[in-house]
């Protein structure tokens, strides 16, 4: 019997796949437990419509993220921090601090997990910081770390 898997099933397949299994296994285990549906033309048509809808949503999210990144790139994010005379920071600037600066300057709430730092920033200066948004959208924003009280 052909079935459409509704969830990942070990040793059978992943969600959305169409698999051939024995009639007894399908009727007595997969279908009653809600792990699969019989692959009728109606079910296949519905599955295809759901796939199309998910693809359209992915494209829409990617477009929105590209627009967001384009907008974020327009700003220079100046972050005042406490630092010594040599330019070394007291502490370090993390992705969380940069996310707060983006929210304050660009008025966009961005999760800190989307800001990628190879290592925490520990000195005053200009930095290109990678922003990696969902759906493979990524780019760099300019961050200037300045000493508190100086412009």
Curated annotation (Swiss-Prot):
InterPro entries assigned to the protein according to its UniProt record, in alphabetical order: Ribosomal_bL9, Ribosomal_bL9/RNase_H1_N, Ribosomal_bL9_bac/chp, Ribosomal_bL9_C, Ribosomal_bL9_C_sf, Ribosomal_bL9_N, Ribosomal_bL9_N_sf
Q: Name one GO biological process term.
A: translation
Q: Which GO terms describe its cellular component?
A: ribonucleoprotein complex; ribosome
Report keywords, A-Z: Ribonucleoprotein, Ribosomal protein, RNA-binding, rRNA-binding
What PROSITE patterns does the database record attribute to this sequence? RIBOSOMAL_L9
Source species, domain of life: Bacteria
Listed GO MF terms: rRNA binding; structural constituent of ribosome
Does this entry carry the keyword Signal? no
Q: Which family does it belong to?
A: Belongs to the bacterial ribosomal protein bL9 family.
HAMAP family hit by this protein: Ribosomal_bL9
Function, as annotated, reads: Binds to the 23S rRNA.
Q: What is this protein called?
A: Large ribosomal subunit protein bL9
Q: Which organism is it from?
A: Thermosipho melanesiensis (strain DSM 12029 / CIP 104789 / BI429)
GN (gene name): rplI
